[in-house]
Swiss-Prot record:
Example of a GO biological process term: translational termination
Localization of this protein: Cytoplasm
Coiled coil: none
UniProt KW keywords: Cytoplasm, Protein biosynthesis
Membership in a protein family: Belongs to the RRF family.
Protein name from the UniProt record: Ribosome-recycling factor
InterPro entries assigned to the protein according to its UniProt record, in alphabetical order: Ribosome_recyc_fac (IPR002661), Ribosome_recyc_fac_dom (IPR023584), RRF_sf (IPR036191)
GO molecular function, one term: ribosomal large subunit binding
One GO CC annotation: cytoplasm
Pfam families per record: RRF (PF01765)
Length: 185
């Protein structure tokens, strides 16, 4: 019974961590990275599709991304979607290839991105603490209904806290790493 609750806690916290890591991976750092375009949705074929389903994206060099469009009719829609994303890329087209030039980041841009990173990180921490509180509430209800003893509750609480601390350490490590990457000129 308690092991199921602990497994649920770990699973939910790891999902929060996974979402957090994908969110911060999308923050651009002044270097060309294909993950920056993961969230781009293109209006084409009478609907909305992700950019990577209608093209292939690769890194040409440190400052350039190359998008190979599979259907040349989609070039206009892709350019529009990229411009609307406000990523600040320079865009040039040649036949079925779109080149995106990553502009140099100013110190203000870097500071703003660090603030955004801090907000995303804190949201993740809050989410993890809420999961811990929810799990502890579930354990207390189990103790109140005599499904587990007070000692079991205390031991489970310590184990849940250890899981929480491990996940929080991963969040903090990812934050520190990304912050260094952002501030590196």
């Amino acid at each position: 019974m308690i092991s199921e609750v602990k497994q649920d806690a770990k699973s939910r916290m790891e999902k929060s961590l996974s979402v957090y890591l994908s969110d911060i991976d999308g923050i651009r750092t002044g270097r060309a990275r294909t993950s920056v375009l993961n969230g781009i949705v293109v209006e084409t074929y009478g609907g909305r599709v992700k950019l990577n389903t209608i093209s292939s994206v690769s890194v040409s060099d440190n400052k350039t991304l190359m998008i190979k469009v599979w259907d040349s009719n989609n070039i206009g829609a892709i350019k529009t979607a990229i411009m609307n994303s406000n990523l600040g890329f320079g865009i040039s087209c040649e036949a079925t290839t779109i080149r995106l030039t990553v502009p140099d980041m100013t110190q203000d841009m870097r500071k703003n991105l660090v603030k955004l990173l801090g907000k995303i990180s804190e949201d993740c921490r809050v989410s993890i603490r809420n999961i811990r509180r929810d799990i502890m509430d579930r354990l207390k209800v189990m103790q109140d209904s005599k499904e587990i003893s007070e000692d079991d509750l205390r031991v489970a609480g310590v184990e849940i806290q250890k899981i929480t601390d491990d996940i929080m350490k991963k969040v903090n490590d990812a934050f520190t790493s990304k912050e260094k990457e952002l501030l590196h000129v």
